[in-house]
UniProtKB/Swiss-Prot annotation:
Protein family: Belongs to the vesiculoviruses matrix protein family.
GO molecular function: structural constituent of virion
Xref: InterPro entries: Vesiculo_matrix (IPR009397), VSV_matrix_sf (IPR036711)
Function summary: Plays a major role in assembly and budding of virion, by recruiting cellular partners of the ESCRT complexes that play a key role in releasing the budding particle from the host membrane. Condensates the ribonucleocapsid core during virus assembly.
Subcellular location: Virion membrane; Host endomembrane system; Host nucleus membrane
Protein name (Swiss-Prot/TrEMBL): Matrix protein
Main localization category: virion
């Protein structure tokens, strides 16, 4: 650098700021616009009830998630809630239990679970508008992967109005199935990125439209 100063006749005086040539660039040449360190926290209270009645018993968790993935085909509500609804449904499905005594003569089975609580969700969807408490019901037939039956889903989420109580909901899901967490998340139609600190953050690869200003023993232990 001193050679450049001599070449261009630049004198460095005490107390003056360094010339541009003497400073190191602080911004990378190629900036990572998908920085998992930049995220928001959605604090919310949630409630979800899930009942699945099928003509044949479920074999794997992947089979179940495949039946639930398209729950929102006819969804007309807030688009911002969509991913959060999908996440609480996922949380409920991870601990879905067979209802004792509901195997019928024809081999059909009923599975059920209810989960509720307060939590926070790290996400990269930007600022979310207020979530108002309302119960939304989704009921649809399933005919896929060799299963026939009916899914009943009742969900609600709402803001905590400034309170910050509850655990990381993504972490709860990860603890329930640590070996298959990311695989199951993708199978239900969600994405998550792991930050440098090991925290899972609800993420997206392709942006979706948004509204203007969204350990109990498992049924499938071996899956």
């Amino acid at each position: 650098m001193s050679t450049l100063r001599k070449l261009f006749g630049i004198k460095k005086s005490k107390g003056t700021p360094p010339t541009y040539e003497e400073t190191l660039a602080t911004a990378p040449v190629l900036m990572d616009t998908h920085d998992t360190h930049s995220h928001s926290l959605q604090w919310m209270r949630y409630h979800v009830e899930l009942d699945v009645k099928l003509d044949t018993p479920l074999k794997t968790m992947s089979d179940l998630l495949g039946l639930l993935k398209n729950w929102d085909v006819d969804y007309k509500g807030s688009r911002n809630k969509r991913r959060f609804y999908r996440l609480i449904m996922f949380r409920c499905a991870l601990e879905l239990k067979h209802v004792s005594g509901t195997y019928s003569v024809d081999g059909s089975a009923l599975y059920s679970n209810k989960v509720q609580g307060s939590c926070y969700v790290p996400h990269r969807f930007g600022q979310m508008p207020p979530f108002k408490r309302e119960i939304e019901v989704f009921r649809y037939p399933v005919h896929q992967h060799g299963y026939n039956g009916m899914v009943d889903l009742r969900m609600s989420i709402c803001d905590l109005n400034g309170e910050k109580i509850g655990l990381n909901l993504l972490k709860e899901c990860q603890v329930a199935h640590p070996n298959h967490f990311q695989k199951y998340l993708e199978e239900v139609g969600l994405e998550a990125a792991c930050s440098a600190t090991g925290e899972w953050i609800l993420d997206w690869t392709f942006p979706m439209p948004v509204d203007v200003v969204p350990r109990v023993p498992s049924l499938f232990m071996g899956d």
